[in-house]
């Protein structure tokens, strides 16, 4: 009897392989569109058991588990066709930029991404939260179950270990902090004394920008749609008096009044359009941190626009400064990948061990009941004898249990498990799926 091991599969498009223009086309910022896309995969790729999508400003990735004996290349071709049709792109263009990973390399990739080793800004912690949200959505919409839950559960543990055992996140660097650092450098070079900034949007990226600006003693005007959300956000700030709010409908009134602007919304269209921009005597510095981009390319020469990809050179110094921590982090990820597969293999024997113990308990209980019924054993001794039998079978199964767990990490474990199931007639035994899933349910709500 051959045990089916989970086949993990990933398609990845990242800032390393794909331009910002193409990543914009792939980006999914709407829950409704994401659900529709995942449903399309489910409908047209029957050999994909579970799937989820991670869509950020720097990457678009599909994580999946495949049915037994499924060819990864076939699933890759099917998914590229779905993407091409869904995003109105050519398969050949996507083929040039895609990275496919399976099995151990796929697991290693997920752990590296979650630990922020594959990020534009190495060590930034925002990606872990984004992965938790992506998993949460797919899990609650029933597109992923046991396989991806186990994978993501372990990935978050790996990311926490990387943060705790290396100094890779101590500087708190992120896209938002790099952007604010560059803005501060510009202000110093330009000798601009009036430290004011306009921030469009109130999502996670914008909130990080605001916090970094406040740390650098800027006054901030936020343009958004949700005043209640802004009031809740103020409670997180040490200096809330330096931040004010206006509805984004008033954008025209403020767009030409600030030298510094940051924009990061989930809108698929341009928020800042050239038709609303007027010429000014002062130079302006705009940071578009959204994907798809929120700011139309300016027509005036004294407006300097920075996109996410434009920040990459500013990030290189950060990467170089973290090489030692990065090497240690990769060691942790490599070890975690190995431990993950050992854990997965051990899970195959856990139900068997449970079934063996249950079989022993039931057999002992039956014989004890017979003995009591035939008065071989006084009724008042029944409880004590039951405890003795329980301890005896635990002692009897102790060594086999250890041996099973040890051999679960070996390639021949499927033969051993199959043989034991046949010997004890346990082939038809099954553990409740929902209970099994809860054991490995990922705490996506944790920090």
UniProtKB/Swiss-Prot annotation:
Gene Ontology terms: biological process: protoporphyrinogen IX biosynthetic process
Membrane-spanning intervals of the chain: none
Ligand binding (NADP(+)): 201-206
Catalytic residues of the enzyme: 57
EC number: 1.2.1.70
GO molecular function terms listed in the Swiss-Prot or TrEMBL record: glutamyl-tRNA reductase activity; NADP binding
Chain sites annotated for binding substrate: 56-59, 119, 124-126, 130
Catalytic activity line of the entry: (S)-4-amino-5-oxopentanoate + tRNA(Glu) + NADP(+) = L-glutamyl-tRNA(Glu) + NADPH + H(+)
Enzyme class: oxidoreductase
Signal sequence, start to end: none
Keyword Metal-binding: no
Pfam families assigned: GlutR_dimer, GlutR_N, Shikimate_DH
Keywords from the named record: NADP, Oxidoreductase, Porphyrin biosynthesis
Keyword Oxidoreductase applies: yes
InterPro entries per record: 4pyrrol_synth_GluRdtase (IPR000343), 4pyrrol_synth_GluRdtase_dimer (IPR015896), 4pyrrol_synth_GluRdtase_N (IPR015895), GluRdtase_CS (IPR018214), GluRdtase_dimer_dom_sf (IPR036453), GluRdtase_N_sf (IPR036343), NAD(P)-bd_dom_sf (IPR036291), Shikm_DH/Glu-tRNA_Rdtase (IPR006151)
Family: Belongs to the glutamyl-tRNA reductase family.
Quaternary assembly: Homodimer.
Domain notes from UniProt: Possesses an unusual extended V-shaped dimeric structure with each monomer consisting of three distinct domains arranged along a curved 'spinal' alpha-helix. The N-terminal catalytic domain specifically recognizes the glutamate moiety of the substrate. The second domain is the NADPH-binding domain, and the third C-terminal domain is responsible for dimerization.
Function of the protein: Catalyzes the NADPH-dependent reduction of glutamyl-tRNA(Glu) to glutamate 1-semialdehyde (GSA).
Additional comment: During catalysis, the active site Cys acts as a nucleophile attacking the alpha-carbonyl group of tRNA-bound glutamate with the formation of a thioester intermediate between enzyme and glutamate, and the concomitant release of tRNA(Glu). The thioester intermediate is finally reduced by direct hydride transfer from NADPH, to form the product GSA.
Protein name: Glutamyl-tRNA reductase
Provenance organism: Helicobacter acinonychis (strain Sheeba)
